[in-house]
């Protein structure tokens, strides 16, 4: 029996996930993957026949609109409109699309691309881009193969059962507590990672479930949505992360996409949030990192003061937006690490696992080893690049990326196998959550796969370790919940 013949029962049915034979329900559509593969072929042809600059801006000009269309088509057929695949394609439409165009024109102007304190040869950068595009295709294949499929039959009445408003509120409160006091949970290691997304997952489920099923009035819904969003914004401001601050608005955007009566507001609110990011959030967070906090000033108040110093409408407004857009496109070009490592491989050869030795302890839970070394290799890579004398002295974390680490160690074949494995295992987690989760913990898993899972793929070993911890954690939780429901049913 193969995994392709197994399917998790839909959470709409009100049951814990159990594996069932559902071959007749698995209708895998490979057309988007084929289109993705054709993009890779075109980029490879450009790399062989054209220069580095042409490869980047020509490939990016095709990848950007194609990925956006594929993301739209993927979301349109999904009950929640947002799926791991749609998020992955949408996100990479910038990293492998618009950012590639931006980098291509910079190279055409004779500018070398910096990577920390190092510089990358244009040809290496173009090769790294194609390798990264190959890795994205491998992830797409794995996700598409393991994606969940709902039962084609109409959901039974249990699928329209009530949803606990108190349970959603409790999980939101626990998630916000974690965001304010993450140090309280540090001893849990990877097990505590879902807590950082619990408030977002709870608020997302709140806006997606009809309020009648939660037994609340329209007024209560509106007040709760405002309080939930405001609390999430305040908690995420404390993180000092531009991405986390903007993630606070995801439940509202999600609600607009799913509810037809509100969908007309998606475009104006989306544009407003875009202007808010480039005009306020990005410059304020950037300024907070440049200006040292005063004595007695907390990270939260320091960032709030920086918000107050955000650019006002005036003569320099366009310049501020332009600078922030340039910074955004530069940061989004994650293939820069692959480009640097292409040069390392050409000079020193493949590492054959030498830089992945931390895998020997990465999969050991911190609960069993409280003093376990850090699994993230960002500080180590910063020192490797020469930006710090030693790993312990590094003040910044430089991402290797899963694709870059796999190529550095095992070449193109390692990228194909390793990234496809990441897609397969994230697809398994997606299948555990279901396509339309109706319970808070299932929604939390869905959010974990769709947002941090698809947007943040650091070192390959780190990604695999995170997937394993989430699989074990949620498998135990779902099993215990199923056993509890079974005992209640028989009592």
Features from the language model and the residues they span:
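Aromatic-rich transmembrane-lumenal/periplasmic boundary elements in polytopic membrane proteins
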Residues: 269-374
